[in-house]
Amino acid sequence: MQKHENAITFSPDADNDKGQKEKRSMKITKWYHVAEFILVPTLVFGLTGVPEPPRKDAAQQGIKEWFLENYYGRAPIGRPSDMEFKGNEIWIGGGKVKLRLDVALPPGVSKERPCPVVLVADRRACFPTPIKPEKLKKVLAVQDEFRRMATERGYALVMWNVNDAAPDCWLYDRYIKMKPEKLPPNAWGVFGLYGGEPDGRKGDTWGTIRAWAWGHSRVMDWIESRPELDAKRVAVCGHSRLGKVALVTGVTDERFLVAYSNDSGVGGAHPHRLWKPGVCKLSFVNKYHLHWLCLNSRKFEADERNMPHDMDEFLALMAPRYLYVASASKDVWAGPEGEQFAAEMASRAWERMNLKGWGYRGHVGGHVRPGEHDFTPYDFKLFLDFCATPFGTTTTCADALRLHD
C-alpha cells in the first residue's frame, strides 16, 4: 500500500481546550491562505458575524427542505410496497429495477455477533460496464483491496452499481437523444417507475444524485433484513460524484451513522461562495451533467456565491452523527481547501450540541492526501480508522482479527 507521509490530516489527539482550538484554527487559516482564498470575510475564524450553525430543530429541518426543493430534488417515494429481496438482489417494480449487491463478510460474523457495514457506491466495476480494460483492471484491484481492508477489521463491505438505479453520464446523454421506441428496456431505471425522466421534469423533481441516494436507502432496507449485519452501525461512502451521493444519503436517511465523501467537490462538500479559479462551477455541472441536480438549481448559476444556503450548512445536517470529508491536494477541480474548510465550519453544529466536532476522535474528520483526484486504499484506510469511534471497534486490523480467534 502506498504511503503518504506528508498527508495533511486534521486529527488532534489531545482534548480541545481553548488554547488548542486557537492553535489549530491558526494552522488551518495559514494553510488555506485565507487572505487570498476566502471571498466572504465573515467566514474567517475569529471575525465577528460568523453565522451560528443551525440547531437540530425546525430551522435545521428548513435548511434540509431548502436543499431538496432547490438543489437535489425530492424523491417521489420512500420504500416501495412491491420491493423484494432475492438473495443479494433488490427487486423494485416487479424486477424492472434490480439493485445487485456485491457483499464481502468478515470471518466469524453471525446473527449472534453482527458486524458493522461499509456501503460503497460504484458506477464502473461492480458488474460489467463500459470501461477500458486497463482501467477496469485497476479499479477491480482497488476494490479487492477495499474488501480485504474492511473485512480484516471485522466490517462487511457492500458495493452496488448505481447505474442499476438510474443512468449516468454517457448513458443519460445518449438516451436523451434517442427515440422512445429505441430505448433499451427500463432505460431510465427508477425515473421510469416513479418519474424524473427528461420529459415533464418539474423544478423540484429529483435528479440522479438524489435518485442514487434513494438507492442507498433501499440497500439500507436490505441491510436491516440481514441478522448478521448491524444496521445501527452503517457507514456510506463514495468518491467524486458518488461522494456527493454519500452526503445526500447521510442527510436524507438518518439510519446511516457515518457519511464519507471523497473528493466530492461542487455539489458535495465544496461551498459555492468559496469559489476560486480552477474550481468547478454550478453552471458547468448543469451544462454537462444536466441530470445530477434538480432544475431549480439553475436559478443560482449566475450568482452562486449568494445562494441562501451553502454546503457547510448541508454538512451540518449530519449532526449529531458522524461526518468524514477527504480531499486531494492537486484536485483543483474539486477544491480541497473549500471542502476541508466547509467541514470545519460545519463542525460547530456538533459543538453546539456539546459534542466533539472536528478531529479524529470527534464526530467530524477529514484528510488531504497529496496527489490527484482518486479514491485510493490510503484514503480508505484513514476512513476506516475514523470509523473505529462510531463503530466502537478497534483501530488496527491485527486487533480486529484477534476477535475472531
Regions found by a protein language model. Give the residues of each.
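Mobile cap/lid helix-loop segments that gate and shape the active-site cleft of serine hydrolases
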Residues: 258-314, 335-344, 348-358
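Bacterial N-terminal signal peptides that target proteins for export
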Residues: 25-37
